[in-house]
Amino acid sequence: KTEYTNASTTQMYNSEKYEWSYDLLKKLGIPTDILTDVIFPGEIVGKVKPELAEELGIEQVPVVAVASHDTGSAVASVPVVDQKDFIYISSGTWSLMGVELDKPNTSDGAFNHNFTNEGGVNKTIRFLKNIMGLWLIQESRRQWDREGELLSFDELERQANAAEPFASLVDPDYAEFQTPGNMPKRIKEYCKKTGQKVPETKGEVVRCIAESLAFKYRQTVEGMEDVTGNKYNVVNIVGGGIKDKMICQFTANATKRVVSTGPVEATSIGNVIVQAMAMGAIKDINEG
């Protein structure tokens, strides 16, 4: 069987009808008989196989379908009171930034902002934008390591905080930044090409990245509000990126929103919450 949150990212699934897009697939010559039934997070799909239970030394416990798309599980872990008031960032190598909707938004505005509709827990829609995230810092750090100087993230953050603010900005989603390589060099070339001050030190490069991400988040918040017609007062950041306190603070400054952080292990916690709901340990996602 195919789990809903994953099916929704294949471009073969109709999230309005909750079924495969059979007509479209037939027109494209894609055989539909290879597609399996779609199941939803929280459904019990069977029990652990006897041989596996024996190997693990456990009983044949139920197997629960969770949000198998990692961002789907991460969003399920976001600790919020008002489901309509928050915008989330699942922060890691990529930043997945969006809101939860009851149904897909396929408006011209969504298309123009390059927003996508992906499935979530409880048949919700994760209406989001994919943004290049901490990859830029990670790849810069790898380059400096290749050059013989591996600095901790804490040290890079210290140097960045000491650098001049708003000296230069880049588009984190610029095509040249997408692949592995000498990221500091590419960032410097981008700044030179766009007539900006070229960052020279490691601290200047990292500050450029951090501020650029924060402004990208602001642009996305404004786009989300424009397309949905809602006002989002809180930005909830989950995932490993919350360890970067500087970017979290810059995000609060740029978006002029309250920023709430945690959990770090968002995907794992969201996974457990769905299993707990399925087994009756908690009554709903809010209790989780």
What is each PLM-predicted segment?
Residues 40, 239, 263:
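Small/polar loops that bind or transfer phosphate-bearing groups
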Residues 43-45, 73:
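Active-site neighborhood for divalent-cation/phosphate handling
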